From Swiss-Prot:
Subunit structure: Component of a complex at least composed of ELL, SNF8/EAP30, VPS25/EAP20 and VPS36/EAP45. Component of the endosomal sorting complex required for transport II (ESCRT-II), composed of SNF8, VPS36 and 2 copies of VPS25. Interacts with CFTR; the interaction requires misfolded CFTR. Interacts (via C-terminal half) with the ESCRT-III subunit CHMP6 (via N-terminal half).
Transmembrane spans: none
The protein's name: Vacuolar protein-sorting-associated protein 25
Record GO terms (molecular function): protein homodimerization activity
Function: Component of the ESCRT-II complex (endosomal sorting complex required for transport II), which is required for multivesicular body (MVB) formation and sorting of endosomal cargo proteins into MVBs. The MVB pathway mediates delivery of transmembrane proteins into the lumen of the lysosome for degradation. The ESCRT-II complex is probably involved in the recruitment of the ESCRT-III complex. The ESCRT-II complex may also play a role in transcription regulation, possibly via its interaction with ELL.
Amino acid sequence: MAMSFEWPWQYRFPPFFTLQPNVDTRQKQLAAWCSLVLSFCRLHKQSSMTVMEAQESPLFNNVKLQRKLPVESIQIVLEELRKKGNLEWLDKNKSSFLIMWRRPEEWGKLIYQWVSRSGQNNSVFTLYELTSGEDTEDEEFHGLDEATLLRALQALQQEHKAEIITVSDGRGVKFF
């Protein structure tokens, strides 16, 4: 069921790999890069990587054009994603990051909709059951990494819709 990724037209345009000096053009270019990063990571269910991995990945490195976005420009794109709430730096050096193609609140909403739809309120789940269990195989959050899942559950906890608990084999969550 692997879907193919459709690169935006800009990806085939060499100047896209050089951040433009004109403020308006740069804003449009950064918006296009942000959209591309989120779409690419969503399709590949990629939630974390280092800046160096990013630079070598097809995302920022168009082998056909023999063009790659420089590290400094990648960091500008990533910082733009952070400002929008779609990225969290995992270290002080800003060399590795967590990419969130959906913000934690959005993931929490999707999970809670599934819980309600399937009549699972007042039930306890392990984190594994939520992201790897048979019952969630058709849900978008199936396969979600634990760091993003915990942020989503924390958002639900703040809304008093869930409580993160410790269960015998790790962490779990009770939904209300």
